């Protein structure tokens, strides 16, 4: 059951979910979701992307085979079933129904209304994303998947959807011959830490994450090219 009022969405009892591969029509939503995760971590001052630069990164300038270049899966929700979902030629969408223990109040529904349903449904809204790409390590003889980030808008957290989205990425890795799924886990976020452990992720405490960026990186630039 669902109601809409002043661009807000209220869902009770059941919510229908679809995980699909993002495309160029989704770029404005991806940009907003990426900004929101920077807000969550208090890193908005580091967010340099634009819709145009993201579109180039994810689609126009991405010549890599499927899932080897920067890839985004979107998790969409609807108060009504996805009955006539068209199959993406690259990736078969994953469908699931969630029984709600509490009412979902989405005050951003209109802003995140899906523009790329492919099945003429008007009541589809983007709830979250997974961003990942291939990585390589001398520990393995084939590529792995680097899981860059998983994010849900506040209205759709703690509903079990994270397990579906991360599990879909893990399934992609297992079914396409990747060696691993790897990423960074924030040790300060116990809920996130416990989530990944419960999903089967092994945490290596003896390693620390390092980054060379900004002015520190530019010190290595070829001065003759300046």
Swiss-Prot record:
Keywords: Acyltransferase, Cytoplasm, Transferase. InterPro entries: Acyl_CoA_acyltransferase, Diverse_Substrate_AcTransf, GNAT_dom. It is found in: Cytoplasm. Gene3D superfamilies: 3.40.630.30. Residues 29-45 are annotated as: Important in binding site and for catalytic activity. It catalyses: tyramine + (E)-feruloyl-CoA = N-[(E)-feruloyl]tyramine + CoA + H(+). Inhibited by (2-hydroxyphenyl)amino sulfinyl acetic acid 1,1-dimethylethyl ester, by DEPC and by N-ethylmaleimide. Residues 72-222 form the N-acetyltransferase domain. Its EC number is 2.3.1.110. The record marks 157, 160, 162 as: Important for catalytic activity. GO terms for molecular function: tyramine N-feruloyltransferase activity. Pfam families: Acetyltransf_1 (PF00583). Synthesizes amides which are involved in stress response in the cell wall. Catalyzes the synthesis of hydroxycinnamic acid amides from hydroxycinnamoyl-CoA thioesters and various hydroxyphenylethylamines such as 4-coumaroyl-CoA and sinapoyl-CoA. Homodimer. Belongs to the acetyltransferase family. PANTHER family: DIAMINE N-ACETYLTRANSFERASE, TYRAMINE N-FERULOYLTRANSFERASE 4_11. This is Tyramine N-feruloyltransferase 4/11. It comes from Nicotiana tabacum.
């Amino acid at each position: 059951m669902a109601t809409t009022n002043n661009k807000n969405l209220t869902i009770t009892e059941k919510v229908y979910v679809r995980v699909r591969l993002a495309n160029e029509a989704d770029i404005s939503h991806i940009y907003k979701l990426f900004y929101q995760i920077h807000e969550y971590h208090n890193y908005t001052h580091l967010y340099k992307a634009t819709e145009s630069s993201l579109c180039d990164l994810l689609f126009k300038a991405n010549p890599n085979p499927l899932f080897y270049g920067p890839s985004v899966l979107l998790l969409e929700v609807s108060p009504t079933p996805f009955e006539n979902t068209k199959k993406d030629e690259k990736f078969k969408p994953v469908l699931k129904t969630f029984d709600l223990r509490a009412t979902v109040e989405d005050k951003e529904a209109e802003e995140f209304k899906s523009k790329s349903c492919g099945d003429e449904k008007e009541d589809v809204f983007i709830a979250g994303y997974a961003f990942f790409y291939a990585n390589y390590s001398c520990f393995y003889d084939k590529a792995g998947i680097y899981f860059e980030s998983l994010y849900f808008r506040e209205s759709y957290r703690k509903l079990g959807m994270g397990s579906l989205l991360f599990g879909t990425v893990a399934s992609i890795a297992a079914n396409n011959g990747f060696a691993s799924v790897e990423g960074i886990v924030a040790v300060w976020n116990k809920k996130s830490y416990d989530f990944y452990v419960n999903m089967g992720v092994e945490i290596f405490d003896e390693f620390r994450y390092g980054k060379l960026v900004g002015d520190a990186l530019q010190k290595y630039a070829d001065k003759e090219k300046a």
